[in-house]
Amino acid sequence: MNKLIRMVPGVLAVVAGVPALAGEKIQLIEHADTDATLDLGAKGDSVGDLLTFANPVYDAANKTQVGSDQGYCVRVIAGKSWECFWTLRLKDGQITIEGPFYDAGDSVMAVTGGTGKYAGAKGSMKLHSRDAKGSSYDLTYELL
């Protein structure tokens, strides 16, 4: 029993060490097909409005659908930014995201966790609009 107790901390150190995904970069393209804005604040674009979505996600070549994402954003600064929470669903697991989404320019959000292959994931995700309409986005996940 004493040997088992001494072994467990070593095993925990290996399990809690650097994940196998460290340094992995995932490049995807989201098609913003279902984005819907709910006008919950003052009439028009205002603090408190809600943006919801459940969109297909494609490989970096924009040819094959490899998953989907779904989530919501709350308007925090009218005409400027949202605070978002969403889940990317891929074949081998999920990655959760949280952070600001800016109306203009790129956004960088935190990877806050995951499931399956991505269990314990952390890092960042850069979001870049591919066009002025916001109909598709480059998503670059950098896992630590």
What residue ranges belong to the model's regions?
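Bacterial N-terminal signal peptides that target proteins for export
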Residues: 1-8
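Targeting-peptide/extracellular-domain and disordered-appendage signature
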Residues: 4, 21-144
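N-terminal signal peptide c-region/cleavage motif recognized by signal peptidases
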Residues: 17-18
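Intrinsically disordered, low-complexity, mixed-charge
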Residues: 11-13
